[in-house]
């Protein structure tokens, strides 16, 4: 299966609110028809207030996230200050575009979640064609098709962290109900003025305990 085909069978979800941005990703890692592990962390901490969620083959996603993280750290060491979220997204998009033009594209789709003191929560959606857009909410993969209507219905920029987490739980529950793919576990992280925080994993047991 091609790398972009693999990314479509994975899922990324994101919500941007006034004081934070929350993203979730499935934790399934497969090779052909074999499940390698179901606790993969696809949400990578790039800096103190920046998370990057990536879909694609394990090699591409890990290598690209580390490439971005190390270059951002190098920039901070050289210049004495770090890049803001918009600048990191611009750097990421340029590298995706350069790879695409070179004939050896980086086959990853991603969500970039960040927090800036002036802008508040920020969410960007990027794909392997280097298309980039700032969005209030986003979803990648076939599973995301079941979630866009839920996000559109319940999204508000004034949501609190518990409320946004509940919206993501609704999305995951619909994925479990409607999608034939096995995506049982979703990791969730939130970035705010306090930094990056990991929230409880959303899985089938979450909904059993909620009853």
Predicted regions and their residues:
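Long, low-complexity N-terminal extensions
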Residues: 1-211
């Amino acid at each position: 299966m091609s790398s972009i085909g693999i990314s479509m069978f994975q899922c990324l979800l994101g919500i941007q609110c006034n004081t934070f941005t929350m993203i979730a990703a499935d934790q399934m890692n497969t090779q052909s028809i074999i499940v390698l592990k179901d606790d993969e962390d696809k949400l990578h901490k790039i800096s103190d207030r920046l998370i990057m969620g990536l879909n694609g083959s394990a090699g591409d996603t890990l290598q690209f996230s580390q490439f971005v993280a190390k270059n951002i750290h190098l920039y901070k060491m050289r210049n004495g200050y770090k890049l803001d979220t918009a600048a990191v997204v611009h750097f990421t998009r340029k590298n995706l575009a350069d790879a695409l033009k070179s004939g050896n594209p980086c086959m990853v789709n991603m969500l970039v979640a960040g927090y800036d003191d002036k802008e508040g929560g920020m969410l960007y959606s990027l794909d392997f064609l280097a298309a980039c857009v700032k969005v209030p909410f986003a979803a990648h993969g076939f599973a995301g098709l079941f979630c866009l209507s839920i996000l559109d219905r319940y999204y508000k920029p004034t949501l609190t962290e518990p409320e946004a987490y509940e919206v993501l739980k609704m999305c995951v529950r619909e994925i479990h109900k409607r999608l034939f793919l096995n995506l049982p576990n979703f990791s969730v992280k939130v970035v705010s003025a306090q930094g990056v925080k990991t929230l409880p994993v959303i899985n089938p047991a979450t909904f059993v305990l909620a009853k």
